[in-house]
């Protein structure tokens, strides 16, 4: 993946805890094109790499806009970019990748965003409007002051945007009404906290929507009980090395400690950067990147979070 040097051109305080960072090329050239739903890897000065969705219209090549929530429970990514970066500072980023594309057969769309989940959804709204595809956007927030990109939403999508504010009965969403029209060319896109997304997905499935019509973007992997973790052994194809992975470490950590180079990014099983081929053994899949069908093949796994059901896992790092 190609990395680029960009400059933080502007910083906007969207809400008390969300800032938008407008990024431009350091050499003045256009930035690589992207599609709605794309994200970029941001390599931070504290050594962490984090993924942030692009929120601006994909027809713009002079800038990228990312929205970053300052999470008090952050592992260091959002805290670093909020506290340690100012306008004019340089950032190293990767080229855009898209794991949350608008389905090619979408003729009508329903967009759901919860909190910071508006970031990829906003870019989708721009794209759908440009393509003249009918859509509605339902944005759920805890309070009015927590609405990110309020000006953009009300200016560009006055007929499509619906704000749903917690504990305000007049803004509550009637899910059954929103989801009552079930048609093969109608697709649903959702991004936000895990519980919110599960609620939307469950509601749609109960209303008769098929899995092929439902699309979601994870920012944080669902919590997994680690108390039952067991140690296992990794054998690296082409070497005589046997790497012991303790119950309290990830496969990636064990491999790096023993000198093996494993690309990592999100460290949560979201981005797919670390996917590694499995030669033999059975992985214990804990990622949200691969599909159930891909998991069933057991021919690859994400060492940043997944483990092994078998005692030994033989992998290919070539």
Curated annotation (Swiss-Prot):
Gene Ontology biological-process annotations: lignin catabolic process
Keywords: 2Fe-2S, Aromatic hydrocarbons catabolism, Electron transport, Flavoprotein, FMN, Iron, Iron-sulfur, Lignin degradation, Metal-binding, NAD, Oxidoreductase, Transport
EC number(s) reported in the record: 1.14.13.-
SUPFAM superfamilies linked to this entry: 2Fe-2S ferredoxin-like (SSF54292), Ferredoxin reductase-like, C-terminal NADP-linked domain (SSF52343), Riboflavin synthase domain-like (SSF63380)
Keyword Transferase listed: no
Presence of keyword NAD: yes
Residue numbers binding [2Fe-2S] cluster: 266, 271, 274, 304
Residues holding FMN: 1-97
GO MF term set: 2 iron, 2 sulfur cluster binding; metal ion binding; oxidoreductase activity
Residue ranges of coiled coil: none
Disulfide bridges in this chain: none
Binding site for NAD(+): 107-220
Cofactor: FMN
Transmembrane segments: none
Domain FAD-binding FR-type: 1-103
2Fe-2S ferredoxin-type domain: residues covered: 232-318
The protein's annotated pathway: Xenobiotic degradation; vanillyl-alcohol degradation
Xref: CDD domains: fer2, PDR_like
Subunit structure: This demethylase system consists of two proteins: an oxygenase and an oxygenase reductase.
UniProt record similarity statement: Belongs to the PDR/VanB family.
Name of protein: Vanillate O-demethylase oxidoreductase
Organism (species): Acinetobacter baylyi (strain ATCC 33305 / BD413 / ADP1)
